[in-house]
Amino acid sequence: MKNRILLCVIVAAGLFSSCDREPVSAVPEGMTLVWSDEFDRDGAPDPEKWVYSTGGNGWGNGELQFYTDKRENSIVKDGKLILTAQSENGLWTSARLKTQHKGDWTYGFFEIRAKVPRGRGTWPAIWMLPTFMKYGNWPRSGEIDIMEHVGFEPDIIHTSVHTNAYNHKIGTHKTAHDTVRGATKKFQTYAMEWDPDYIQWYINGEPFYRFDNPHISNAEWPFDIPFYLILNLAIGGTWGGQQGIDEKMEKAEMIVDYVRVYQKN
């Protein structure tokens, strides 16, 4: 695990200090680290932890990119995972990684430190889908969006859940957004606590949205089955492309410092 250093620059007079502090973690008491990737080995993403999703079928959202398993689109370098979307002769390629069958969890605390790209038309996301569609295909078995960002709103971070009762297709999805100054310029910590009774989201250690289990049926709450993590960088699409794609943009990067999963002891 990375050892993070609190770097403080002390002015000679001793009257002023400038400290670059990592945001406070919101890991609840009684949780133990059960899975992580600190990206401390250069090269391709760890095949023991990540699986590539490849293809260019629009992914249900009219996205423009073709997801590949090339190192040009996903590589670990200098302690970071870099997902790169790039235009090649007018066609976009990018990367989508998942932990399905490598890391699947029911309940826990999920923490990811990442920096999202700047550029109109980008659509990065950190999210979760069910390992098995126990209650039926999307959205019946659920979706949890830990973080979504669209390039035409550079300082806004979105989160949501989708179920059969609550989803964007019928305009009922449970969603929230928050202003995060500098989301595209420096790393932020995105986290989600998933409990049998609620899902709570955090940004930089601060809670900002909560969805409570209504205890009615799996149409409202299908979140009692294993889910896996997804990291992806899309281009365009029904949401990311709402205001077009920057014609001058040839490349965009989503950079991930770490991914950590905790569960109760």
Where do the model's predicted regions map?
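Bacterial Sec-dependent N-terminal signal peptides
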Residues: 1-26
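GH16 jelly-roll
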Residues: 19-265
